Curated annotation (Swiss-Prot):
HAMAP family: EF1_beta (MF_00043). Pfam families: EF1_GNE (PF00736). This is Elongation factor 1-beta. The gene is ef1b. InterPro entries: eEF-1beta-like_sf, EF1B_bsu/dsu_GNE, Transl_elong_EF1B/ribsomal_bS6, Transl_elong_EF1B_B_arc. Belongs to the EF-1-beta/EF-1-delta family. It comes from Methanospirillum hungatei JF-1 (strain ATCC 27890 / DSM 864 / NBRC 100397 / JF-1). Gene3D superfamilies: 3.30.70.60. The lineage of its organism: Archaea, Methanobacteriati, Methanobacteriota, Stenosarchaea group, Methanomicrobia. GO terms for molecular function: translation elongation factor activity.
Amino acid sequence: MGDVALIIKVMPESPEVNRETIVATIKEKFPRVQDIREEPIGFGLVAIKVALVVPDAEGQTETIEATLNAIDGVERAEIVESTLV
């Protein structure tokens, strides 16, 4: 099996949440992070878009979403794109 590239949109709980802490935690939990960008949503809220490469294994995406959703300050995380690498 190969690898899968994922684009994940991580929404903080509020504009006051420290995004740098969330980004640091993501990098700690997922060493194969390729890119992290911020995307303004509105009213001061900024989403974090993460490009991540993971092994192509069954149940992998659900595990990743659950791990990201468990980070303090994260309201929700969802995979918005995926492709085989």
